[in-house]
């Protein structure tokens, strides 16, 4: 599991560079120490992959163009592919850490356009 302390972008874009993810193995797991990131935040970014996360320590504010949500230790969330998002450690928090699972949505839908994809994955 890779420890993340900053977001790396593809040149000229807000698309996150995700080393290690490929068509052969469309999944990566990482441990994000948000309190050790510059500005205690992960800047606005997006990726083609879906993201499932679990808050291990502390709490953070998660932003998308559609709104904000606060996640505390023991809670988690899901961000679908191609969704612009950012997160920041809540004020007054010490350690803020999350476990991230980033994967191609086809891993759970089977194939693009399948009933599982149309009914349960794409609408998220």
Question: Where are these predicted regions, by residue range?
Answer:
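Histidine-centered metal-chelating micro-motifs
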Residues: 59-61, 68, 77, 81-90, ...
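A hydrophobic/aromatic-rich effector-binding and dimerization subdomain
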Residues: 2-10, 17-24, 84-124
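Tight coil/turn sites that cap or link beta-strands
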Residues: 37-39, 73-74, 82, 104-106
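Generic protein-terminus/edge-of-domain signal
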Residues: 1-63, 67-70, 76
